[in-house]
Regions:
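Short hydrophobic alpha-helices that are characteristic scaffold elements of the AMP-binding
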Residues: 10-16, 38, 150, 159-163
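Conserved AMP-binding/adenylation subdomain of ANL enzymes
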Residues: 126-144, 148-217, 244
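Adenylate-forming
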Residues: 1, 46-55, 186-240
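Conserved AMP-binding A3 loop
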Residues: 103-129
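ANL superfamily adenylate-forming
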Residues: 49-99, 203-217
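Conserved pre-ATP/AMP-binding loop-to-beta segment of ANL
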Residues: 69, 89-107, 114, 136-141
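Conserved AMP-binding/adenylate-forming
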Residues: 1-27, 145
């Protein structure tokens, strides 16, 4: 799941000339093992919540050379500690990434068959993050609610946000989106249509209030933009949000 250690791992990987392969943490361990093997991964960085995966990969993924735990304080014979590695290897990289070198492999969801590994270069991701002028000022507060193993979230929430000098707040659970909106008071959120429909219901629940108060109640006083992607958004939904 999206977290600060995840972002450190991702940027440390791609800025050192290695290839990152973000995976859906909610998949069964057997499915994850298949993707790890297909990607020819040699290092696995995982959350302690997926201890089941850490055990299975030892026998199922012979190409793996290192297992890294995000929570473990100290390394042992079987697993390296993410925190210990950070303490012992502080500094900067002497590597300058080549624009057309492989940067990230992202697996498709597999809704139309077997998931495919999409190979993205440093240039692909850099252009994804910079090709769209969204007129977003620096220090814009973005609440990141989408799965980071999807290109939409990685490119637009994280890479675009960092390139603009935004403040990126990480939502820890889809069950706490509304709570975290009130906590972080974001200016902007990227969502998919299904999530936007859920937020529309929240607006309708307090629709008896003046429009400005409706928006403040659901999104906070600083909020001004929802970006929709990943699927078709009905025009009626756009009209509803335009009222606020």
């Amino acid at each position: 799941a999206t977290s600060y250690p995840w972002l450190v791992t991702y940027f440390g990987t791609v800025n050192s000339g290695s290839v990152a392969v973000p995976l859906d943490v909610s998949l069964p361990a057997e499915d994850l093992c298949e993707l790890i093997d297909r990607a020819d991964a040699t290092v696995l960085v995982a959350d302690e919540l997926r201890k089941d995966l850490m055990e299975i990969v030892k026998s199922r993924c012979p190409k793996l050379r290192y297992l890294i735990s995000m929570q473990k304080e100290e390394s042992d014979e079987e697993t390296l500690s993410f925190r210990q590695l950070l303490r012992e290897h502080e500094g900067v990289f002497g590597y300058e990434p080549e624009p057309d070198s492989l940067c990230t492999i992202m697996f498709t969801s597999g809704t139309t068959g077997k998931s495919k590994g999409v190979m993205l270069t440093q240039r692909n991701l850099a252009e994804n993050a910079t090709c769209l002028d969204m007129k977003i000022p620096p220090r814009t507060v973005i609440l990141s609610v989408l799965p980071i193993h999807h290109a939409y979230c990685l490119s637009m929430d994280i890479l675009k946000g960092i390139s603009l000098g935004s403040v990126i707040c990480i939502n820890d659970s889809l069950l706490r989106v509304v709570k975290n909106i009130k906590l972080f008071q974001p200016n902007m959120i990227l969502m998919v249509p299904l999530m936007i429909e859920t937020m529309a219901k929240k607006l309708e629940e307090v629709s008896g209030l003046p429009p400005k108060l409706v928006k403040w109640q659901v999104f906070g006083k600083q909020f001004h933009t929802i970006c929709s992607g990943g699927a078709y958004l009905p025009p009626a939904m756009i009209d509803l949000f335009d009222r606020y």
